[in-house]
Amino acid sequence: MTEEIAAEGLSRNIPAFSRFLIAATLSNAQELNFSHVADDAGLARQTVQAWFTILEETMLGEQVLPYAKTVKRRAIERSKFYFFDLGVVRALRGFPTITDGSSDFGPFFEHFIFLELAAWRDYRSPQSKIRYWRSTSGYEVDFILDDKLAIEVKSKTKVGDRDLRGLRALAEEGTISGFLVVCREPAARLKDGIGILPWQVFLERLWAGKLF
């Protein structure tokens, strides 16, 4: 990390890098738009792109690449970005209160599930790939694991039909075999071939190797 920081001159530009980090947290768990982050931080786009690379190389964050194997609906080509720790995001945002119903609760819940997926991959299945899918028409699925399992994360305690739109749209492509919603419902159930799992059950099955 010291070499990367020295190479980019970060030690001489701490205020700018601090602005970058704060702006980067606003894109956490979202599509990564270097130009928007650059505008928010008052920096050049090329600088922001290079600094995101440093975050990845120093394992402070990770880009999730888009899943592009759809035909009926064209996929967005931007990656999503997740910091390595929820506490870091919260600290850089000034320690906002994260409560059920707050605007940050859903993205933080999604981030929490991503961190579990990433940990499972790193420790149990290093060859596995985590992707996400979003169509140009607005359909989205939060995670796709190994091009086999589509996972939508909802912080709700009751999942409705509208919450399944992205999974159903992806199912029409015929490229994915399994579909799950990870949520805060009290019990597992099945809805039109889509598994709806409490997050605790999902994590138990993930770490037990019973998702596929």
Language-model region placement:
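Short beta-strand/turn micro-motifs composed of small residues
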Residues: 134, 181-183
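Active-site ExK catalytic segment of metal-dependent nucleases
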Residues: 146-159
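Short active-site-adjacent structural elements
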Residues: 140-141, 159-162, 187-191
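Short, charged, amphipathic alpha-helix that recurs within catalytic cores of restriction-modification
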Residues: 156, 162-175, 179
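Domain-level recognition of nuclease-like catalytic cores that cleave nucleotide substrates
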Residues: 186-212
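Accessory nucleic acid-recognition modules appended to NTPase machines
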Residues: 1-149
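Conserved beta-strand segments of alpha/beta enzyme cores
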Residues: 129, 178, 193-195
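Structural beta-sheet core signal
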Residues: 150, 180-181
